[in-house]
Amino acid sequence: MRTMTRTRNSWNLRPAVAVGGLALSAALLATLFSDRVAPLIRTAVADATPTPALLPLGTPAPDFTAAAHDGQKVELSKLKGKWVVLYFYPKDDTSGCTKEACDFRDNWSTLQKKGVAVFGVSTQDNTSHKAFATKYSLPFPLLPDDKGEIAAKYKVPLMGGLARRITYLIGKDGRIAHVWPTVNPVGHASEILAQIEPTAAKAN
C-alpha cells in the first residue's frame, strides 16, 4: 500500500510540475517578447540573415529621392562629385545601430574634410529618426524607408521588417565603389576612410 501511495503521490505531483513549467514558460516568453527585448531580438535576426548577392562594384548606384529626418530632400543623382556613404541599419536606438551611428558622428570632422556625405537608412519613420538623431547628436541625415523601396534597389534584405546592416560606398562618379556586406559597428567609419584614401590617390 505504501508503494501504491508513493506512486500515486508521484503521479499526482507531475501535473503540478507540468503546470508550473507551463506557467514559467509563459512568463519567459512574455519577458522575451516585451517591448524592450523584442526589438533587440529582431535586430539580431536582421544582422544574422545570410549574406545576399549585392550590387557589383562599378554598377551605377540606383537613384532615389527621400525626405530626411531633418527636412532636407535627398536626391542621390544630385550628389555626383561627392563620396556618398549609404549605410543600412536595422533599428534606431538599439545597441549596434547606436554604436555605428555614433562612430560616424565621432569621425564627422574627418569625413567632412574628405568630402563624404553620409546617409543612414532604416525602415523606421522620421519621428523615430528625429528622436534618435537628437538623443545622440547625429550630424548627418537619416532616411525613412518604411516600404523598403531603397533597400530593394540596393538588394538589402529585410528580416522581420528590419534591414540587414550593409554599407555601400558610392564614388564621385555615381558608381558603387565598395560594399560591406557585414559590418562591425565600431570602427566602421575608419574602414570607410581607409577605403577612400587610396582610391582618391589613384584618381589624382
Show the residue positions of the predicted features:
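Thiol-/selenol-based redox modules, centered on thioredoxin-like
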Residues: 163-204
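Short active-site neighborhood of thiol/selenol oxidoreductases, capturing the structured segment around
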Residues: 76-98, 104
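Structural microenvironment flanking redox-active thiols in thiol-disulfide oxidoreductases
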Residues: 93-136, 146-152
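Short, small/polar residue-rich loop motifs at catalytic or cofactor-binding pockets
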Residues: 60, 83, 162-164
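A short beta-strand-turn-helix
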Residues: 55-56, 64-84
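Short acidic-hydrophobic, aromatic-tinged amphipathic segments that line or gate anion-handling sites
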Residues: 141-145
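N-terminal targeting signals for export/organelle localization
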Residues: 2-63, 67, 202-204
